[in-house]
Amino acid sequence: VLRNAVIRLRNLYRLRRSLQRLNPDLVFFACLDDMLPTLAPLWLFNLLLPYQWSGLLVQSALPPYHRGMPDTRPFLRSKNCVGVGILNEYSAKGLETFQRHILLFPDFADLSAPATNYPLLRKLKERARGRKVISLLGSINFRKGIKLLLESIPLLPKDEYFFLIAGKSSLTAQQENDLRAFGESRNNCLFSLEKIPDESCFNALIAESDLIFAAYKQFTGSSNLLTKAAAFRKPVIVSRGLCMGRRVEQYG
């Protein structure tokens, strides 16, 4: 905890030295989460960042605040902060204690026309052969609910449903081997643990899917996967209660 706090303060010091040459009227941080300190007196933070600033707080739904514990939110009270943007509208009320000017940002998504010549798309069509396609897409890790999906696959008729997992993996080598072995043992699975080349290819997989699996574990943030699912009119499975679940219940 202390090491992380020191690293963040050191980064702010370096940033201040870089900004001195520019003397900006306003500094905007595209990911404020990585810039705010976790442990420091507020006067020191104001000294290190003496310019008016704002930014996007990507993960804005945080655990309850406890005074004296490492937390970025008290630094939103800085006299130089002119406002904070968030993606998760349900977290706004909890942040108003620290900053009155909270702005809701849309979670933009690239809706480029689906690629028609993507090799993985052709392979999916060949393997699925008309079955309903359930897809888990994007960065592949166990926070994305892979375990739940794998437990569900044997419970559904394999002649009716086909399962796609595609995206860049952050699993261990053993986890990847286990996942591939599971997929290869069944005729209704296609697992590709490589990065999806671009948004057109990503959208092609969305368009070919019948259901998007997004039941992430303890994920409190927003995801533009909901935007893509809505744009391509695909139903989506999400975890109940948090941001994505509340949006689906409210608008779905």
Residue ranges, per PLM feature:
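Nucleotide-activated donor-binding/catalytic signature segment of Leloir-type glycosyltransferases, i.e.
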Residues: 131, 175-200, 204, 208, ...
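Short hydrophobic beta-strand element within catalytic cores of glycosyltransferases
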Residues: 211-212, 235-239
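Glycosyltransferase donor-sugar binding loop
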Residues: 137, 162-177, 195
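Active-site proximal beta-strand in glycosyltransferases
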Residues: 26-31, 42-63, 85
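Conserved donor-binding/catalytic core segment of Leloir-type glycosyltransferases
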Residues: 124-144, 150-153, 163-165
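Short N-terminal targeting/anchoring amphipathic segment
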Residues: 3-8, 15-38, 54
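Acidic donor-binding loop of glycosyltransferase active sites
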Residues: 204-221
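Donor nucleotide-sugar binding/catalytic pocket of nucleotide-sugar-dependent glycosyltransferases
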Residues: 54-63, 74-122
